[in-house]
UniProtKB/Swiss-Prot annotation:
Protein name: Putative aspartate aminotransferase, cytoplasmic 2
This protein's GO CC annotations: cytosol
Modified residues (N6-(pyridoxal phosphate)lysine): 249
Quaternary state and interactors: Homodimer.
Reaction it catalyzes: L-aspartate + 2-oxoglutarate = oxaloacetate + L-glutamate
Keyword Amino-acid biosynthesis part of the UniProt annotation: no
Gene3D superfamilies reported for this sequence: Aspartate Aminotransferase, domain 1 (3.90.1150.10), Type I PLP-dependent aspartate aminotransferase-like (Major domain) (3.40.640.10)
Further remark: In eukaryotes there are cytoplasmic, mitochondrial and chloroplastic isozymes.
GO molecular function, one term: L-aspartate:2-oxoglutarate aminotransferase activity
InterPro entries: Aminotransferase_I/II_large (IPR004839), Asp_trans (IPR000796), PyrdxlP-dep_Trfase (IPR015424), PyrdxlP-dep_Trfase_major (IPR015421), PyrdxlP-dep_Trfase_small (IPR015422)
Positions of transmembrane segments: none
Main location as per UniProt: cytoplasm
């Protein structure tokens, strides 16, 4: 008699967005392209890595003085401090007053896992989470698995082809008292001074707890300080918050999964208490975070010359993205593609919306073998001199073929 498996009743999981990459890999068309990679790509179609990171990795590997003992539960102290200085500035108010701290995590997903665990245990009145970003984020799954009620909103206005701050403000207006707000892509959402004031006032009056997501610092504008400037607004207004800080993408060490859960409190005593609880959760989640990526980043950030070289490499990536967007827009103009394409260059960062509807996206995938997400948000570093003509002509074809549909 056959033995029944304990896994008999386990169903196949629902397909996620990652299945797009699987479909792409199964496609045997020689012209196929994938424009949704999360990492920055070079002009030759390889993942981008800063040259100073390559050199630093080699130096660390050849350093006989280094040991490979377990990392402390809270992570490398020098790495966490360097990460905080990068985010807020070494002489910022929150650093000087010892109101900011952090825990080294396994990438941004680890930061959200750790933060969600804390909120579930110690902020039981905040069991509703709003995730507001320029795109659909995977963090909702983490909060859902923790038992939170999750609502996801985007402030991309597909009708007017822009990121609309009023959509963000509207979500805050209708959010319940005491909820958690996971906010990403703030650098892309151009709020006026009056809108900033309105946002702060609304969040304070409703006692909303902000949980920021900063995965691409320096890769939005090319200016590290500018990309994190919005955090200073919240600090200056006396907000307490969490922040998921990923350093994998802007250093080009995607396989290392290097991140920090940043904590800002009203005073140092509160910070120490929060960090003590986070340490207990981290001990249960992963105990000891990985070392190599943290060592690379600390070495670069703590050496002025190396940090300067790294900053220049970020500026180079952003400049290339801006030029690529300009070329795409110009080629679409020369092709006579219907509609305005100014929204392409008005968006910041490597990941931006093309402004295509679902029918046009499906046409690109099925007819042209160009794989992009349903929302039409692509990685512009995937476009280079070898494929730009095919991509723009395919976009033109998709728009013209479906010209009776609204973008």
């Amino acid at each position: 008699m056959p033995t029944l498996s304990v896994f008999t009743d386990v169903p196949m999981a629902q397909k996620l967005e990652g299945s797009l990459l699987k479909t792409y890999k199964q496609d045997d068309n020689p012209n196929k392209m994938f424009l949704a990679y999360k990492v920055c790509m070079t002009s030759k179609g390889r993942p981008w890595v800063s040259s100073v990171v390559r050199k630093t990795r080699m130096q660390i590997a050849q350093d006989p003085s280094l040991n490979y003992e377990y990392t402390p539960v809270m992570g490398m102290k020098s790495f966490v401090q360097a990460s905080l200085n990068l985010l807020f500035g070494k002489n910022s108010q929150v650093i000087v007053e010892n109101r900011a701290g952090g825990v080294q995590t396994v990438g941004d997903s680890g930061a959200f896992q750790l933060g969600a665990q804390f909120l579930k245990s110690w902020c039981q009145s905040s069991q509703i989470v709003y995730i507001v970003s320029s795109q659909k984020e995977p963090h909702g799954l983490i909060f859902q698995d923790m038992g939170f009620t999750v609502y996801e909103h985007t402030f991309w206005d597909s009708a007017h082809l822009c990121l609309d701050p009023n959509m963000l403000l509207d979500v805050v207006k209708h959010a319940p008292h005491g909820c958690v707000f996971v906010i990403g892509s703030m650098g892309n959402c151009q709020l006026t001074p009056s809108q900033w004031t309105q946002l702060m006032t609304l969040m304070k009056s409703k006692e909303i707890f902000p949980f920021f997501d900063i995965p691409y610092q320096g890769l939005s504008t090319g200016d590290l300080e500018e990309d994190a400037r919005f955090l200073h607004y919240f600090v200056s207004q006396g907000f307490e918050f969490f922040c998921s800080q990923s350093l994998s993408k802007n250093f080009g060490i995607y396989d290392e999964g290097v991140g920090t859960l940043v904590v800002v409190t009203l005073d140092n005593q509160l910070l120490l208490r929060v960090l003590s609880q986070l340490m207990n959760f981290a001990r249960a989640l992963w105990l000891n975070p990985p070392t190599t990526g943290a060592r690379i980043i600390t070495s670069v950030l703590c050496n002025p010359a190396m940090q300067g070289e790294w900053r220049q490499s970020l500026e180079g990536v952003v400049e290339n993205v801006m030029m690529t967007k300009e070329k795409v827009k110009e080629k679409l103009r020369l092709l006579g593609t219907p509609g305005s394409w100014d929204h392409i260059t008005e968006q910041k960062g490597s990941h931006s919306y093309l402004g295509l509807n679902s029918q046009q996206v499906e046409y690109l995938i099925s007819e042209k073998h160009i794989y992009i997400p349903k929302n039409g948000r692509i990685n512009f570093t995937c476009i280079n001199s070898y494929n730009i003509d095919y991509i723009t002509s395919s976009i033109n074809e998709a728009v013209c073929f479906t010209k009776d549909s609204e973008r």
